[in-house]
């Protein structure tokens, strides 16, 4: 059920660059309407500036096509683009589905360059991260999570104030790390990995599964508990598809698929370092 989402994020990480803007459906990530390519972009912000007007034009175009289809117009009346959109959705479709789709056209910028930079940073950090995760008896596969959070950048800072490799916000970090004006251990790759391992293990013990523990790392343990109760299921697929809490938006719904995508791409590197550690222990 999550495979289309995972495949979408693998393409965002490994195929689409900063000059690529993917117009897609917010809920069904199999539906990609178009990829706008800005070849002359020299950096991420420049690419966004160059593509802004074209993206807005295309977004409105697809919204208009979907609305027209929902109102009963035939694909043929809407020309080649209308026919292509109808084929993407496998129409004839229910009007409600098409009206919903008209409000769900989203744009995702490619991340290939950021991913490549993250891979370079990960090479120096991965052996120590794997070792720390093992010390805390948590899955070494969690070593893929910093790629989703920060592309392995210890100096990363989000708009929400999350900091470091593992993107701790101040309130959460204070339970595990030293955070003050003089010293902020969120920037320390090793100390923050120790803290992340403890937090993830705590989430796992409270929620009973690693998929839920990983989502809780983004959405909070209480938020995941609420989602589980509302949906009436422990299955991560059910929660992602069926839960529509006010704070459980696109980013939260896709956090676990993004992790799985990063894990698939990074798995050989993680297993390599895990194997090297096993060899050292056995020697």
Locate the predicted segments by residue.
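An acidic, Gly/Ser/Thr/Pro-rich helix-cap/linker signature
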Residues: 1-136
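Short, well-ordered helical secondary-structure segments
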Residues: 3, 45, 49, 76, ...
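A general marker of short, structured functional hotspots
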Residues: 9, 17, 29, 58, ...
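Extracytoplasmic and endomembrane cell-envelope/extracellular-matrix remodeling and assembly machinery
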Residues: 80-124, 135-136, 175, 179-183, ...
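Short, surface-exposed glycine/acidic/tryptophan-bearing loops
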Residues: 100, 156-177, 233
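A generic alpha-helix surface/boundary motif
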Residues: 126-128, 146, 167, 171, ...
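Carboxylate/His-rich catalytic cores and anion/metal-binding grooves
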Residues: 130, 134-168
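Short, small-residue-rich loop/turn micro-motifs
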Residues: 149, 169-173, 221
């Amino acid at each position: 059920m999550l495979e289309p989402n995972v495949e979408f994020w693998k393409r965002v990480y490994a195929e689409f660059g900063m000059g690529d803007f993917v117009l897609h459906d917010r809920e069904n990530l199999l539906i990609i309407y178009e990829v706008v390519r800005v070849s002359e972009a020299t950096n991420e912000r420049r690419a966004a500036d160059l593509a802004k007007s074209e993206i807005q034009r295309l977004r409105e175009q697809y919204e208009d096509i979907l609305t027209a289809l929902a109102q009963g117009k035939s694909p043929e009346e809407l020309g080649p683009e209308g026919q292509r959109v109808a084929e993407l959705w496998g129409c004839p479709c229910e009007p409600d589905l098409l009206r919903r789709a008209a409000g769900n056209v989203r744009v995702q910028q490619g991340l290939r360059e950021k991913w490549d930079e993250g891979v370079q940073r990960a090479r120096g950090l991965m052996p120590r991260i794997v070792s720390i995760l093992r010390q805390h008896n948590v899955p070494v596969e969690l070593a893929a999570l910093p790629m989703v959070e920060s592309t392995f950048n210890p100096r990363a800072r989000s708009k929400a104030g999350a900091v470091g490799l593992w993107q701790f916000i101040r309130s959460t970090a204070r339970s595990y790390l030293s955070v003050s004006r003089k010293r902020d251990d969120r920037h320390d790759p090793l100390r923050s990995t120790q803290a992340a391992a403890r937090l993830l293990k705590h989430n796992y013990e409270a929620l009973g599964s690693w998929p839920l523990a990983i989502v809780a790392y983004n959405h909070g343990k209480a938020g995941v508990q609420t989602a589980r109760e509302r949906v009436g299921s422990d299955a991560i697929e059910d929660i992602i598809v069926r839960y529509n809490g006010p704070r459980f938006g696109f980013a939260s719904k896709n956090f676990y698929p993004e992790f799985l995508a990063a894990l698939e791409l990074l798995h050989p590197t993680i297993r390599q370092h895990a194997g090297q550690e096993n060899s050292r222990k056995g020697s």
